Amino acid sequence: GSPIMADDPQEAEDIVSICSALVLNMGTPCERTFRSMLAAGKEANKRGKPVIFDPVGAGASAFRNELAATLLREVSLSVIKGNISEISFLTEGSGTTSGVDAHREALSTENNLNEHVRLAQRLSEKTGAVVAISGPIDIIADSREAWAVRNGHPAMAALSGTGCMSAAVIGCHAGANPQAPLLSCVCGMSGMGICGELAHER
């Protein structure tokens, strides 16, 4: 993919018109980006383009919570990708978000894998989106099917921004395969994990 970033409402619709997919990232929200994301999301829906939502920090502030709730309500999302804290908040209205990182004790492991799959599937049923939960084991699920992706390296957790990169990679796959959001998510998350493995080796 060839990326472009925009956050002004005046160009949101124009930028969406030339993109294959839209990634909405809640990393640095403000009133302007709130309006931009809403306008861009609605335009992408109108044009039938996949929308990937990365609810960075959902649950950390009332403003972020309002933005996330508005996007869930007013935009048809193809993919929601977040850490376990963010996905828990979107699903249940509660969580342990205190920054962009998930709390270590909440991360997906073999012991809680089924519980986290059910959480992802509940949010998928609620929104119609494929849900990806990033962590030591990445979980990708829709309401009928779930995948566990075990690629990656623990060092990736120490690098801020890898989650945002993953959302962009998913966007590239979804833009090329707009009718296959689940497969796009699996390819994006596993590909990002493989990149982390190779980077650590080098």
Regions found by a protein language model. Name each.
Residues 1-47, 53:
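Active-site cofactor/substrate anionic-group-binding motifs, chiefly glycine-
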Residues 29-32, 57-61, 139, 156:
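Short, small-residue-enriched loops and turns at beta-alpha junctions
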Residues 33-82:
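Glycine/small-residue-rich loop that forms an oxyanion/phosphate-binding "nest" at active or ligand-binding sites
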Residues 64-146:
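Conserved phosphate/ATP/ADP-binding segment of small-molecule kinases
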Residues 149-161:
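Short pre-catalytic strand/loop immediately N-terminal to key active-site residues, enriched for Gly-Thr
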